[in-house]
């Protein structure tokens, strides 16, 4: 399976990079993993609704241009469906079973994701009703993907 994480903005925090690199290395035993960073749109501190929509639209175009047409797209959204680790593992297993070898996870920028990206999404996934920094979500997401593969192979993992 090919797992791609598309995320808005550059990861600057060294400790997050180290954690992500560790899980990416571990995941190589199960899947091909790539991380694509698309540029975030520079935005003023205070914006009108129209300006916010435009920022999301521009970031959305960059996100969409990095997604293969045949990929199964999972967007991370506060209002998405909440799944437990076992349920996410089952979903990834089902995708592999039904021939969906390309799975793309999308993490939007600080304003979220555009409606165009939401329309392209096959599954809107929520990790919590809380808001997290999108850089931190990369680490949380890649750990959960790793955990999913361990679960699907009957290997031990922390509950």
Swiss-Prot record:
Chief localisation class: cytoplasm
The UniProt record lists the keyword rRNA processing: yes
Positions annotated to bind S-adenosyl-L-methionine: 76, 108, 127-132
Taxonomic superkingdom: Bacteria
Top EC class of this enzyme: transferase
Pfam families associated with the record: SPOUT_MTase (PF02590)
Catalytic activity: pseudouridine(1915) in 23S rRNA + S-adenosyl-L-methionine = N(3)-methylpseudouridine(1915) in 23S rRNA + S-adenosyl-L-homocysteine + H(+)
Cell wall biogenesis/degradation among keywords: no
GO cellular component: cytoplasm
Compartments, record wording: Cytoplasm
GO molecular function: rRNA (pseudouridine-N3-)-methyltransferase activity
Keywords annotated in UniProt: Cytoplasm, Methyltransferase, rRNA processing, S-adenosyl-L-methionine, Transferase
Subunit and partners: Homodimer.
Stored HAMAP family: 23SrRNA_methyltr_H
Function of the molecule: Specifically methylates the pseudouridine at position 1915 (m3Psi1915) in 23S rRNA.
Family as reported in the entry's similarity comment: Belongs to the RNA methyltransferase RlmH family.
NCBIfam families (alphabetical): PRK00103.1-3, tRNA_RlmH_YbeA
Name of this protein: Ribosomal RNA large subunit methyltransferase H
Gene: rlmH
């Amino acid at each position: 399976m090919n797992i791609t994480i598309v995320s808005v903005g550059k990861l600057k925090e060294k400790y997050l990079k180290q954690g992500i690199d560790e899980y990416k290395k571990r995941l190589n035993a199960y899947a091909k993993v790539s991380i694509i960073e698309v540029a975030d749109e520079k935005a003023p501190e205070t914006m009108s609704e129209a300006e916010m929509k435009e920022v999301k639209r521009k970031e959305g175009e960059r996100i969409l241009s990095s997604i293969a047409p045949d990929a199964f797209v999972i967007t991370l959204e506060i209002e998405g469906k909440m799944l437990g680790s076992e349920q996410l593992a089952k979903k990834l297993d089902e995708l592999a079973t039904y021939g969906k070898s390309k799975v793309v996870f999308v993490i939007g920028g600080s304003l979220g994701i555009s409606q165009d990206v939401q329309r392209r999404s096959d599954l809107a996934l929520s990790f919590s009703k809380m808001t997290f920094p999108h850089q931190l979500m990369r680490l949380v997401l890649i750990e959960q993907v790793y955990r999913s593969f361990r679960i699907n192979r009957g290997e031990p993992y922390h509950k």
